[in-house]
């Protein structure tokens, strides 16, 4: 890349791409390089968000941390941003520690796509800090839920991105 093409956008895009290769390589034998990936097609249907997803977000929004987490299989994996949490209870405990330490959240579903064993969600989360001197933010979210092969009603692996919350 020559100097005249280096913009803030290309710099941010390049910086954002760096950790993706290592996350992909560490996740369920997913190849780090596209040339190593077997390509396939999948049909998605845009539909209303299912009850399990709404119940999960409600547990976080209400800070109740209960049955909404039952959408995850017992040994589910979550990679939310830089997290690497293993097990339903670890997912619950780590989200609780993150949210309870400083803000109240409200999740808003904008669109939900059902692709069978892969569910895709896009929306926003309003994050209101407990400290009134801090500003409320509303970052975008995108989440991929890979459902369990044996029990397709349970999430086996969750990949999610939220933010950035500030620049």
PLM region spans:
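N-terminal secretory signal peptides and thylakoid transit peptides that target proteins
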Residues: 2-18
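Charged catalytic carboxylate motif
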Residues: 10, 48, 52, 90
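Short, low-complexity N-terminal intrinsically disordered segments enriched in polar/charged residues
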Residues: 15-66, 70-71
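A beta-strand edge to alpha-helix "cap/lid" segment located at domain peripheries
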Residues: 30-43, 79, 92-167
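Short beta-edge strand/loop motif at the mouth of beta-sheet-based domains
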Residues: 85-93
């Amino acid at each position: 890349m020559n100097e005249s093409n280096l913009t803030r956008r290309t710099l941010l895009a390049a910086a954002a791409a760096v950790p993706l290769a290592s996350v992909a390589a560490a996740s369920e034998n997913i190849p780090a390089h596209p040339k190593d990936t077997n390509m396939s097609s999948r049909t998605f249907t845009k539909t209303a968000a299912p009850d399990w997803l709404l119940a999960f977000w409600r547990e976080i929004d209400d800070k109740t941390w209960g049955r909404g987490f039952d959408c995850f299989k017992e040994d589910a994996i979550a990679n939310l941003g830089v997290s690497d949490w293993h097990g339903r209870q670890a997912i619950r405990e780590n989200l609780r520690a993150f949210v309870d330490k400083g803000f109240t959240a409200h999740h808003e579903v904008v669109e939900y796509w059902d692709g069978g064993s892969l569910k895709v969600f896009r929306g926003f989360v309003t994050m209101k800090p407990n400290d009134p001197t801090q500003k409320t933010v509303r970052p975008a979210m995108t989440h991929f839920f890979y459902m369990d092969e044996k029990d397709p009603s349970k999430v086996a692996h969750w990949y999610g991105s939220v933010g950035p919350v500030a620049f």
